[in-house]
C-alpha cells in the first residue's frame, strides 16, 4: 500500500481560529474522523488518553490526513458527512488529498425547499373566533 505524505506527523497548524477536519489511523488500521482548531494538539490529547474515548487504548495513533475547512459550522457538517463514508472512501482521500475540494463542496451546499406562496383564506375565515360577524 502506498504511504500518504500525511503519514508523518505534520508540523504546522492551521491559522488561528480556523477549524480543520482530520483522520487518525489506529494500530489496527481503523480511521477516526475528528475536528479541531489544532489537529496536532488534538492528536497529542488522543495519544495521551485525554482525547476521544473511541481512541483510548488503540495506539499508536498516526495523523494521516488533515484539511483546514474554515468555521466550526462547516467543520461539523463535513465531519458528519465524512463519518458516513466508507473506509475505502477515506483511504482514497488519504491517498489523493487533492480531491478533497471536489468531494466536499457538495456537502457544504445547503439545499432548502422552495417556499410556497401563502394560501389565501376564505373571507368568512378571516373573522375573529367567537365573533358572529354581526354589528351590535
UniProtKB/Swiss-Prot annotation:
InterPro entries: GIY-YIG_endonuc, GIY-YIG_endonuc_sf, UPF0213_domain, UPF0213_GIY-YIG_endonuc
A Pfam family reported for this protein in Swiss-Prot or TrEMBL: GIY-YIG
Segments forming domain GIY-YIG: 17-92
SUPFAM superfamilies named among the record's database cross-references: GIY-YIG endonuclease
Similarity section: Belongs to the UPF0213 family.
Stated name of the protein: UPF0213 protein ASA_0550
Source organism (scientific name): Aeromonas salmonicida (strain A449)
Amino acid at each position: 500500500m502506498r504511504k500518504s505524505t500525511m503519514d508523518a506527523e505534520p508540523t504546522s497548524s492551521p491559522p488561528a481560529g480556523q477549524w480543520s477536519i482530520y483522520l487518525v489511523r489506529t494500530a489496527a488500521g481503523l480511521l477516526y474522523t475528528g475536528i479541531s482548531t489544532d489537529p496536532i494538539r488534538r492528536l497529542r490529547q488522543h495519544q495521551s488518553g485525554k482525547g476521544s474515548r473511541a481512541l483510548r487504548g488503540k495506539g499508536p495513533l498516526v495523523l494521516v490526513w488533515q484539511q483546514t475547512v474554515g468555521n466550526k459550522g462547516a467543520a461539523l457538517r463535513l465531519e458528519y458527512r465524512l463519518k458516513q463514508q466508507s473506509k475505502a472512501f477515506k483511504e482514497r482521500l488519504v491517498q489523493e488529498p487533492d480531491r478533497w475540494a471536489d468531494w466536499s463542496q457538495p456537502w457544504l451546499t445547503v439545499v432548502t425547499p422552495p417556499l410556497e406562496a401563502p394560501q389565501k383564506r376564505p373571507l368568512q375565515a378571516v373573522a375573529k373566533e367567537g365573533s358572529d360577524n354581526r354589528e351590535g
